[in-house]
Every structure is written in structure tokens, then in C-alpha cells.
Regions:
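Proline- and acidic/polar-enriched loop/turn elements at helix boundaries
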Residues: 54-56
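Intrinsically disordered, low-complexity regulatory regions enriched in serine/threonine/proline
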Residues: 2-28, 58-252
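Amphipathic alpha-helical segments
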Residues: 28-52
Length: 252
């Protein structure tokens, strides 16, 4: 029995036709199931990825050592939007006090990513911008004033509507960043955006590793020396990983 069927039966059993359900909230487990049942098939088909974890979808690595990653970007534990970007086989991530590779489904990390401009450029005092922001959000929390038996269908419809709204932007992003050179240009644009600098402080590190990958080694090392790290040990670990790229080649 699907999530929709289970919740539908619960509502049929607990609410009379004339009862007004004001608030309805899916549990975290139910939300995961709803997304897996109703959004994953669309995401996998439209973006050529597979679900690899709850709220995370990714492709296989391509010949350049890149893989698409789409995931939830949480506002809190009940509201989220989507983020989309790339994971790179040759770029590590910082995990606690260690700099490690992010090459498996379990350790996957989105090195460079974007969100809808309608989401981060919202202005609560501007009605049109607020409406655009609302179109980018999904939630496991729902308010309905009548016809409680249809609440799950309404949540599913709302999720699909948000995904449909964002899909063209996501698809255009991947078309516009399909090479390392195009990704570098995109990183430079994001570095001019205070919002992206705030939510993704690793952009400069990603840029350095891509430069090194493209054989611009002197510039990569020069730019690396300008990056501020939380401590010297982390910097040294990143530098060691950077130099190890001399021996890197995509495993395909």
C-alpha cells in the first residue's frame, strides 16, 4: 500500500465529511515516502539521475569526473526548496578536522550548486516576489479548511507543481555548465553574489582544484595561497590533495 493510500485511509477513518481539518503534517518518514513515490520518478526521468538517499539524486560520474547532484535545501525540518549542482571526483571536502574525498554515494557532496533566484531574491514586502518565492518551496506541513480527505492529494499536487516550476531552470543550469570551462565561469559569477559566497564558502577551493585539473597549475597554486582557512592543518591537507592531482585521471 502506498503512502497516499495509507494516509487516505487514515483520513477516511478519522474525519467526517463535514469536519474541517485545519492543520496536517506528514511525519519525516511519510515525507520521505511521498517524495520517493511521487517526485523521484519525475526527477529521474527529466534529469537522468537516480535517487541515492532520502531527498538526494545523482548521476554517475561522466568522462570528466563530474556527476550531477540534486537535493533538498532545507529552511527547517518541515520546509525546503531544491538545490542542484555538481560533485567532482577530484575535489575533496572538509569533514570535521579531516579533508577527505567525496566520491561515493554515502560521502557525496555538492561542491558547486545553485538555487532558484525566486527563492533567494525574495522580498517579504513585495507581493510578486513573495508569490514567486512560494512557488519554490515544498513542505510536509499543510493547512486546509475543508475536504480533509483530499489533503494528501493536495500535498502531492503542491510538490509536483513546485518541481515542475523549477525543472526548466535546473535543466538550463546543466546545459550551461557541461564543461569545466563553463563551470569556472559560473563559479566566478557566483563569487560576485554575496548570497552564494555565504551559503557555499567552498567555491574558491572548488575553483582552485578545477584550475589545477585544467593544467593552470601556477594560477591554481597562487589562488590557493590567497584562501583563508580555519587552521593551518586544514590548509595543508587541502594542499596535499591538490598536488596529488598530478596523478589523477577519470576512471572511465
Amino acid at each position: 500500500m502506498s503512502l497516499l493510500q495509507k494516509c487516505w485511509q487514515f483520513l477516511v477513518n478519522h474525519f467526517e465529511d463535514n469536519h474541517s481539518l485545519i492543520h496536517f503534517e506528514l511525519t519525516a518518514t511519510q515525507w520521505k515516502a511521498l517524495v520517493r513515490e511521487h517526485l523521484t520518478p519525475i526527477i529521474e526521468k527529466e534529469l537522468q539521475v537516480k535517487q541515492i538517499a532520502d531527498f538526494v539524486w545523482a548521476s554517475e560520474y561522466n568522462s570528466l569526473g563530474m556527476r550531477k547532484v540534486i537535493s533538498f535545501f532545507y529552511l527547517n525540518n518541515a520546509y525546503a526548496t531544491f538545490k542542484w549542482g555538481w560533485n567532482f571526483e577530484f575535489i575533496p571536502k572538509c569533514s570535521g578536522s579531516k579533508v577527505v574525498w567525496a566520491r561515493t554515494d554515502k560521502s557525496i557532496y555538492t561542491h558547486v550548486y545553485e538555487l532558484s533566484k525566486d527563492f533567494y531574491n525574495s522580498d517579504g514586502t513585495n507581493r510578486k516576489k513573495r508569490e514567486a518565492y512560494d512557488r519554490t518551496i515544498v513542505s510536509r506541513y499543510f493547512v486546509i479548511e475543508k475536504n480533509a480527505k483530499n489533503v494528501i492529494k493536495k500535498i502531492v499536487k503542491d510538490h509536483k507543481k513546485t518541481l515542475k516550476y523549477l525543472l526548466p531552470t535546473i535543466q538550463e543550469y546543466y546545459r550551461s555548465t557541461e564543461t569545466m570551462e563553463l563551470i569556472l565561469r559560473r563559479i566566478d559569477l557566483n563569487l560576485e553574489n554575496p548570497y552564494y559566497c555565504f551559503i557555499n564558502p567552498g567555491l574558491l577551493i572548488s575553483k582552485v582544484f578545477i584550475l589545477y585539473y585544467l593544467k593552470s597549475k601556477e594560477k591554481a597554486i597562487s589562488d590557493f595561497e590567497k584562501i583563508s582557512f580555519q587552521c593551518e592543518d586544514i590548509k595543508n591537507q587541502y594542499y596535499k590533495k591538490l598536488l596529488s592531482m598530478e596523478e589523477y585521471s577519470p576512471k572511465r
